Amino acid sequence: MFIRMFLYAKSNKEAVGICNDILSNIDLYTEKKEIVEIAPYWKIEGIFQIELSVVLKSNSIDNEDLERLLKTFSNIWLSYGQPIDEILITRKLDGSIMYNEKIEMINIFFDSEKIIAS
């Protein structure tokens, strides 16, 4: 799984701390999380882009687990693909409530062998 996060932060260190806090609920489902890249987002000052590679445990996340996890980020998200291979969480969606004010947007991409049946 690949996760790209856009977070409000003042430094790399702060962005990593926010990222770890936000993703603490995913630890139950992962064998390994690794930050691949972190940098200020060139389009918007005050936002950092963090990219993570995540190795899921042998059992894929089922729909119930996924929904429970997503509800820790926001009340609304978009999913793409059949079966689902991408999820978008963004404060730009009408009615969206982010449960961490530091989140601007999160993209979650699922590996082909770990795709969720919808």
Where are these regions (language model features)?
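Short, extreme N-terminal segment that most often corresponds to the first beta-strand
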Residues: 1-25
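Generic non-transmembrane alpha-helical segments
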Residues: 18-29, 72, 76
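Short secondary-structure junctions
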Residues: 26-34, 78-83
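Short edge beta-strands and adjacent turn/loop segments
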Residues: 33-48
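Charged interaction segments
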Residues: 45-118
